[in-house]
């Protein structure tokens, strides 16, 4: 496998979303552990995480997922080093996930080491739709087999990326990453991003 580009999901891949969930729990008038319990139910049932509000019998905050930007302190400790290391291999590095356009502005403002920054808002389609991954390949300007997609969710990242012909890399952290086992379709599975560049360099 001769990779030319590696694209990264955002939430729970590069960014620890704990602060984000706490903020929305506060806006909904709920304790954080109540939100996390409901989130666990949606993961176990294979539901979209937006269903958690229905399980709790409350309306989502009006600003749900649209006006809260990340902070540089939300990045996982290994995120920047990983992006830089992958870039150091001579590979194109991209960041694109199911995010509002505000994420793109944040990533550029923080000068994250990526050659391509986009979002589902800009692409006009969300994961796990196959078209999302086809557009990722277009952004990479190479063949699908030359692109890797790194994400924490088996259902939204790993399986659909593999089905679209990309190398699918599973990072096992965050709620989904810890509860969803790495499937056979994954090219590689990791508990963090610290050793990703070395693993990519050793791929045939």
Where are the language model's segments positioned?
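Hydrophobic alpha-helical core bundles mediating ligand binding, dimerization, or RNAP-core interactions
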Residues: 21-28, 49, 65-69, 103-107
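Metal-dependent phosphoesterase signature
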Residues: 35-81
